[in-house]
Amino acid sequence: MIFDTDVLIWFLRGDGAAARLIESQSDRAISMISAMELLQGARSRAEIKTIHQFIQQSDIRLVPVNESISHVALSLIEAHALAAGLRVADALIAATAREGALPLATGNARHFKAIAGLEVKAFRPEAG
């Protein structure tokens, strides 16, 4: 399963639902884009260290953006940016999940609902 950035943020904030979801999956993966978004949102060196520890200790596979994912994301932007407001990071994350034939766990299912061939698992945090 690919985890969207929001699920990871909830996990790092101590949300039990996010922890259960992540821990229940034997194949845990995130797009390199999500790792970048987490690091970009860090407010201190300590938070950066926490993010790195989380990725290592959770046995989460980082999926790089390759040529195939880039081309799929480009077509998703073309198809969904105007009508649905699909943004670049979400297109790359969706393309990563679709190319890997993995479901995408996200609290923002509406961002991805129009994308054919993408299995979306809606996530709802305990705190939300």
Q: Language-model segments: what does each one mean?
A:
Residues 4-5, 38, 97, 112:
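Generic structural signal for small/hydrophobic residues in well-ordered secondary structure
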Residues 24-25, 58, 115-116:
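Short, structured coil segments at secondary-structure junctions
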Residues 1-30, 40-53, 127-128:
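Short, well-structured N-terminal submotif of metal-dependent ribonuclease cores
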Residues 36-39, 74:
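Amphipathic alpha-helical segments within well-ordered protein domains
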